[in-house]
Amino acid sequence: MTSNPVYLLHGFGTSAARTWRDNGWIDLLADAGREVIAPDLLGHGDQDKPHDPEAYIAVEDAALAALDRGADGTTVDAIGFSMGSRTILALASVHPERFGRIVVSGVGANLFRHNDDPAFLANAIAADAVPENPAAAYFHQMARTPGNDPQALAAFLRRPQSWPITDEGLARIELPVLVVIGDDDFAGPADPLVERLPDARLVTLPRTDHFATPKSFPFIDAALDFLGAAP
C-alpha cells in the first residue's frame, strides 16, 4: 500500500472543517502518516460565495487546481462525500492518472437520475419560508447553518454543468474504488454506480442515512482500511 497524500472533498452545504476535521478524519489520517489535502469548494466554507450561477462553472477546475497545489504533481488517494464524491469521479474520469485509490460515499443511483431537477432544491434554499416538502425543508434549513450563504448555495446548484458524469467517463476510472452508501440514503442504491466502475467494491452502512454518513464509524474504518491507513 502507498503513502499517497489523501485528497478530501466535502459535500454540498458543508465544508472541509465540518465534514472531515470535526468528524476526526484529518487527525486519523495524520496519525497514519498521510498528508491531507482538504479544500473547500467555491461557495462553501472559507471560499468566496458569489451569487451568480455562472461563477460556479469552474468548480471542478478549481478542485483540480487545489489538488495540484497540494500534491505537487504526485498521485493522490481520495475520499469524497456526496457532492465531493461526484466531483472526484468527474476529475478521475478525465485525469485517472492523478489518483491511486478512491473512496466515494453518499452517491449512487442519484448520479443517473436525469429527471432530478437541481432547480427544485435551489428554489427551496432561496425561499423565504420553510418549504412543506421534507427534503426541501431540510436543505432550506441546512443552507442557513452558520457560515453558509443560502443565495450562494442556490447559485451553486443552478450552475452550468461542464464536467458531466457519463458511462464512458466512469469506464475510464480503472482504479480501485470503494463505494460506501447508507442503507437509508436517498442517493442510493449504489449498485448502478458500482456496475459502471471497472474495479469497484460496495460497502453498505446499516441504519445510516445520507447526512449521518461522514461520522459513521463503519465508514471511517472501511475507508481507512481501503487506503491502508487504518490504525
Can you say where each PLM-predicted feature lies in the sequence?
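The serine-hydrolase catalytic nucleophile loop
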Residues: G13-I26
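Conserved alpha/beta-hydrolase
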Residues: L29-D48
